Amino acid sequence: MGLLRLLRGNKASAPVARERLQILLAHERGMRGQPDLLGVLREEILAVVSKHVTLDPTKVIVRLERGDEVSTLEVDIEVPNDLERKRVAVA
């Protein structure tokens, strides 16, 4: 009996594999419609900091590291030594 089962294969693994593939495809399809999270975060952070300090956008680095339990957002902004501040109009 064991030899026949070995030759026929395990029928239970096919539905499990199909379900996993469907989950993976659904996840991938869901990600396509979303904007690039890291790009959006970079632009929004740049806009906020630019209101107060003159900076070079090419000197801003944003990294997102995803872990199993925690994700880390690292923002590296190079600010000039003279710290040229912008004047913010008060309404």
UniProtKB/Swiss-Prot annotation:
Would you say which domain of life the source belongs to?
Bacteria
Q: Which Gene3D superfamilies match?
A: Cell division topological specificity factor MinE
One GO CC annotation: plasma membrane
- Mind listing the UniProt keywords for this protein, alphabetically? Cell cycle, Cell division
Cysteines engaged in disulfide bonds, as pairs:
none
Q: Pfam families, per this entry?
A: MinE (PF03776)
What is a biological process (GO) this protein takes part in? division septum site selection
Q: Can the keyword Cell cycle be found in this entry's annotation?
A: yes
- Function field: Prevents the cell division inhibition by proteins MinC and MinD at internal division sites while permitting inhibition at polar sites. This ensures cell division at the proper site by restricting the formation of a division septum at the midpoint of the long axis of the cell.
Membership in a protein family: Belongs to the MinE family.
Name by which UniProt lists this protein: Cell division topological specificity factor
What lineage does the source organism belong to? Bacteria, Pseudomonadati, Pseudomonadota, Alphaproteobacteria, Hyphomicrobiales
Tell me the name of the encoding gene.
minE
